[in-house]
Amino acid sequence: LNRQKTLELGATLNPIRPLNIAISAYSGKEPAPLPTSANSGTRTSINATASFNINDAISVGGEVLNVTQDVPVGGGATNSVKYNGVAGYGSFMFTSKIRGALRVENFDDKDGFHFGTPGTKYREVTATGAYLAADSFEARVEARRDQGTNAVFRQYNGALSKSLMTIALQGLYKF
């Protein structure tokens, strides 16, 4: 249970009609990441996304993420751990009811802060097909492949692998 205070700042900008920019920052005390049992340290997350509608059918976007945390190491000293990522995506409306999207992400967890295995870089590719059945309902099928430089993904048999493939069926109701 974390009862510490967190500061959150955010801004959404729409400087021209087809461009949307969102920036957010969070900072506050969080429990130290595993495998340590150290006390809480200050975690700071900065995220920026931008999307641009090229026309009614095509949109592109990008995202940048940077997260750091100070981990107490004793005697009042701290060690800073971090991870960061960058992503790009695009979507295309094939018809008024069918949309496709592709997302590519690179993620660097060099300190093992997020996934627990230091020195690991990740690449993820997601392809999404969507059927817009109504203004309030969307059906999706999504295929995602994750690839790491180290074996960090647990397989069905318990062994670790450098890659992971997932498929999802989704129904989204908008209200």
Predicted regions and their residues:
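Outer-membrane beta-barrel pore domains
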Residues: 13-15, 19-175
